[in-house]
Regions:
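Histidine-dependent nucleotide/RNA phosphoesterase domain, centered on the 2H-phosphoesterase fold
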Residues: 1-177
């Protein structure tokens, strides 16, 4: 199974993202994410068997125990890659705690022996892939600065359900002791 550690989003945040994505979809063609798939990835892991999932759970619990619940807030739209083949995303307001949480998860997974991709953590929620954008028009799509409390981290499985990509929660680890 393909797995990643992330933060699930509440309904208000999903609503705000869906509203922005719906407006973007009218302007920019692409493969848009399903509303229920919106999340913030802390660390992509990749293929994992049952034994690996046990190690991941231990790493998640250790990382989560170090942090009290905290808030995240939506920022504006932006993109990765080239405008003709972009990943459209909504950023999050910079949060040192969020960055530290992602780093803690990563360090514990590396210590447990996982091979992880290199790269700097960039907090975001993917709205579309293979989007054809006009970068100047992105600013015309407002994003309500919705926020939410982060109280847990989640291990998600990326799988197909009725031929649709879904991110299914496998386990949750509450923040704090």
């Amino acid at each position: 199974m393909r797995v990643f550690v992330g933060i699930g989003l509440d309904e208000k945040m999903r609503d705000s993202l869906w509203e922005a994505a719906s407006k973007a979809q009218k302007l920019f063609p692409g493969r848009y994410s399903a509303r229920e798939n919106y999340h913030c990835t802390l660390q992509f892991i990749g293929q994992a068997d049952a034994a690996a999932v046990q190690l991941i759970e231990k790493a998640m619990k250790e990382a989560a125990a170090q942090f009290d619940p905290f808030s995240i807030t939506l920022a504006g739209l932006s993109f990765f890659r080239r405008p003709q083949d972009a990943v459209l995303f909504c950023g999050l307001v910079k949060s040192l705690i969020l960055e530290q949480l992602a780093q803690s998860v990563r360090e514990r997974l590396l210590t447990a022996g996982f091979k992880l991709e290199d790269g700097e953590f960039h907090s975001h929620i993917t709205l579309a892939r293979q989007a054809r954008l006009d970068p100047k028009s992105l600013s015309l799509i407002p994003v309500a600065p919705e926020g939410q409390q982060v109280k847990e981290i989640t291990l998600f499985e990326s799988c197909r359900v009725e031929e649709q990509l879904r991110y299914v929660p496998l386990m949750r680890c509450p923040l704090g002791k």
